[in-house]
Amino acid sequence: DYTTYRSIRFKPEQSLWHGVNDYELQFFHPGFLYEYPVTIHTIGESNKPERLAFNSDMFNYDGSASGLAGLTDEKSGFAGFRVHYPIKNEEYKDEFAVFLGASYFRLVGKNQVYGISARGLAIDTALAKGEEFPHFTEFWVIEPSEGKPITVYARLESPSVAGAYKFVIQPDIDTSVKVESWLFARDDVSKLG
């Protein structure tokens, strides 16, 4: 349930690139509404992708979630991830980008609050036959250089469409993202958005 899922919290000191980069990645625990885990890879100086294994030691399991610690293995994957960067000041790294659930993502700038999430792709919305929800299934995150934007590649899958995405995200007063996508039809689609 919602209360139990909210009681599982990522440990900030476990953030990827913690203490070595202005950017940090934090991860979301699989479960609750997020039944399709994603595989996350990072690409650093070696230019070779490294798969990030799920590790329950990255999370605090408080309250009603305390009995769940250790029940998820390293093959499980994560529900998604968020990116932190010192937008407001150098002492604190703000969350400014989130990839979580289906093909949803959202961004925020300095002194802003999140609004509605964007989607990588919407298929057959508001049709009698029902909507199809594509999912980002795999991510490759390029470790950014100092002062440069962060680049995220994503694989999108659904019964009707496969896709590849590139997000170049620049955190700032007005955080910006440049999105490139390549879509491949597997079946007929009535409505694409």
What are these regions (language model features)?
Residues 1-127:
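Solvent-exposed N-terminal domain segments of exported/luminal and surface proteins
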Residues 6, 41, 153, 180-182, ...:
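Short, well-ordered alpha-helical packing segments
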Residues 9-13, 158-160, 183-192:
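A generic secondary-structure signal for well-formed alpha-helical elements
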Residues 36, 77-79, 146-150, 161-163, ...:
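Residues at beta-strand starts and edge strands
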Residues 44, 56, 154-158, 171, ...:
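A mature extracytoplasmic/lumenal domain signature
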Residues 45-47, 143-147, 171-175, 187:
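A short, structured loop/turn motif at beta-sheet edges
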Residues 117-171:
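Extended, loop-rich substrate-binding clefts of extracytoplasmic carbohydrate-active enzymes
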Residues 166-193:
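Acidic (Asp/Glu-rich), glycine- and aromatic
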